[in-house]
Every structure is written in C-alpha cells, then in structure tokens.
Design a protein with these regions (language model features):
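Acidic, polar ligand-binding/catalytic clefts
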Residues: 1-23, 102-106
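Pocket-lining segment of extracytoplasmic ligand-binding domains
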Residues: 4-7, 35, 72-164, 168-169
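Extracellular/periplasmic catalytic domains that process cell-envelope and extracellular macromolecules
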Residues: 10-12, 21-23, 42, 112, ...
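Bilobed "Venus flytrap"/periplasmic-binding protein-like clamshell domains
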Residues: 21-91
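Short amphipathic alpha-helical coupling segments at ligand-binding clamshell hinges
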Residues: 170-180
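A C-terminal functional module that forms or caps the active site or interfaces directly
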Residues: 178-185, 189
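Conserved small/polar residues in nucleotide/adenosyl-binding loops
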Residues: 193-195
C-alpha cells in the first residue's frame, strides 16, 4: 500500500506509519476430518469460503489457490466471515474455509470440539511460489495439538500483523500506544490465544 504495488497497484497510501510488528498470522485451511480432502489439490471441484470480501484472508486465499493452479473455474468460492464459514462447514454446506489469523483461533477451536477437523498443509512448490511472489509471506509451522484433534504439524505461510497509525496522530499518542504495547506484552500475548 505504501508503495502502491501488488493489491494496491496505482493506489499509493502514504498517510500512515508502522508502529510495531505484532505477531504472525497463519494462513489456515480448514476441512472436516471425515472429508476426502487431504491436500490443496483435493479442493478441485469443491465449495470453499475464501474469507470476507476484500479481507486479508480473501487475498491470501486467492493467492494460495492461484499458486496451486486452482482457478475460479475449478473451485466454487464464497465470501463468508469466519463464524459463517465454520457453521457452513459444520453443516456440510461448504467443504473448506480459509482463515488468516493467529493460531489457537477461537472459532477454529470451537469448531474442532463440535466436529473433527483437519488443517491442510501447503506443499513445497506452493510455498516457494508464494514466498517468491511477495516478501510479506514467510514459512510458518502450526505445531501439532494447536487445536483439538490436530495431531500433526501443519506447514503453511504466515503474514506479519502490523499496527499502523495515521500520520495525523501526535508523537505523544504514538509513544503512549507503543509504551502500552511493550509494557503489557505478556497480557497481549495471552489475549491472542482467544482470537
């Protein structure tokens, strides 16, 4: 956005500054454990939620699908928020959903307790394509047992969550925010578990 490239091509946004990098959000792809979907290739012909319209999740999902060769003709997509997507998956109304968020995401954990789930890993080819296409993507491993019933680690990509502030904010206000972030770092880490 700052340089007007990528998704912001031609739309330079320079009225803000980064205050701090917060945490890494994992691109999580959730399916029912009783499904026949074990890899991204298995999503062909399936009905999936790629996140709310114009969200970071939607952007990540589209880029992951493109890197896998799954065009909009090969998958049927919906723009559900996480709660809608989890409900739709639980009710067999969709086959998978994307969720870009910190791990231990509450909506995924609640779903896992209600209906067994599986998270899909990205293969090495997909990971390399994504990381070559954008410096914002990093290799990320979701540890085994992050969610109920998830007994294997999951290989995916992550994106850094960054706190931005308008350049109109006073330096004093930015200093107060920054100080609060670092003085309450442990509290914030604990609260992220419940996202």
């Amino acid at each position: 956005a700052y340089e007007g490239t990528g998704a912001f091509d031609g739309n330079i946004c320079k009225d803000y500054s980064a205050i701090a990098g917060l945490y890494t959000e994992a691109c999580q792809i959730v399916v029912r454990a009783d499904s026949s979907i074990y890899s991204l290739d298995d999503l062909q012909g399936k009905h999936i939620s790629i996140g709310a319209s114009e969200s970071g999740t939607e952007r990540n999902a589209k880029e992951i699908l493109a890197a896998t060769g799954l065009t909009s003709r090969l998958v049927q997509t919906e723009n559900y928020d996480y709660t809608q997507a989890a409900n739709q998956l639980s009710n067999h109304e969709i086959d998978a959903f994307f969720c870009t968020a910190g791990t231990k995401t509450t909506i995924i954990e609640e779903l896992a307790k209600e209906c067994p789930i599986r998270l899909l890993s990205l293969n090495e080819t997909c990971l390399k394509k994504l990381m070559a296409s954008s410096p914002s993507y990093i290799h990320y491993t979701i540890p085994a047992n992050t969610y109920t019933g998830q007994d294997k680690e999951v290989t995916t990509i992550g994106v850094k969550s960054i706190l931005l502030a308008s350049d109109d904010l006073s330096e004093d206000t930015v200093n107060i925010i920054t100080k609060a972030l670092f003085e309450h770092n442990k509290d914030l880490q604990l609260s992220l578990i419940h996202i």
